[in-house]
Amino acid sequence: MAVIKCKPTSPGRRHVVKVVNSDLHKGKPFAGLLAKKSKSGGRNNTGRITVRHVGGGHKQHYRLIDFKRDKDGIPAKIERLEYDPNRTAHIALVLYADGERRYILAAKGMQAGDKIQSGVEAEIKTGNAMPLRNIPVGSVVHAVEMKPGKGAQIARSAGAYVQVVARDGAYATLRLRSGEMRKVPVDCRATFGEVGNAEHMLRQLGKAGAKRWRGVRPTVRGVAMNPVDHPHGGGEGRTSGGRHPVTPWGVPTKGYKTRSNKRTDKYIVRRRNK
């Protein structure tokens, strides 16, 4: 994987930094694992904007990813690595011994031809998945479930991983990249290794148009709006906003705690680093 800085042949190319991976499949994705993906433009069923800065972008298909890794005891081979427009991580097309194909998240170091397996009898090896009760303490894992059988929810983006730091009774304690320590049931599954494509963070799009290709619309500052549109709006000439920064709905936006799910507080051993 190479990081390439483009020559400044135009203003739009001057700041472009590309991450090039020659191992990725250059053809079309596997048709049997594609699904329709409709664009909402950030609107809900009433037609009102519920998510700002969303709209446009290139047409995409959704890749059906196997986040459960529940095909136990059947060896599989990595056929190829692919680009996925729906996530920062790359994905791997897996062929099982019984002929079934599935997409999984591509782990760091994974290559075409590698052998992987799921289940308690799988060896401790990058790409293999098993319940946390069978994973040695100190192991680095990704694609971790929060509820047994629900599918992976933790550490799924490019370069992400968590570390298993303890196991006590029915729960395993994980250290997340944010510094948070969290308890997860030991029957939840995880995959060895960390998610690949960690160089994604080095990428620079270089121009506004590249953001629009990805379906991201411009962000307008509150102080540039009218009073009817934002609490920071209005005033004669340029103003500082006149108050501490808030969202368009008046909620403080700099360090204000918004977590309200007390039901799951008992699973958080230590809050994330500030």
From Swiss-Prot:
Protein name (Swiss-Prot/TrEMBL): Large ribosomal subunit protein uL2
This protein's UniProt keywords: Ribonucleoprotein, Ribosomal protein, RNA-binding, rRNA-binding
GO cellular component, one term: large ribosomal subunit
A GO BP annotation: cytoplasmic translation
Assembly: Part of the 50S ribosomal subunit. Forms a bridge to the 30S subunit in the 70S ribosome.
Domain of life assignment: Bacteria
Role: One of the primary rRNA binding proteins. Required for association of the 30S and 50S subunits to form the 70S ribosome, for tRNA binding and peptide bond formation. It has been suggested to have peptidyltransferase activity; this is somewhat controversial. Makes several contacts with the 16S rRNA in the 70S ribosome.
Classification of source organism: Bacteria, Pseudomonadati, Pseudomonadota, Gammaproteobacteria, Alteromonadales
The family this protein is said to belong to: Belongs to the universal ribosomal protein uL2 family.
Keyword Transferase: no
UniProt source species: Shewanella sp. (strain ANA-3)
Keyword Acyltransferase: no
Pfam families hit by this protein: Ribosomal_L2, Ribosomal_L2_C
Record-level Gene Ontology MF annotations: rRNA binding; structural constituent of ribosome; transferase activity
Region annotated Disordered, chain positions: 223-274
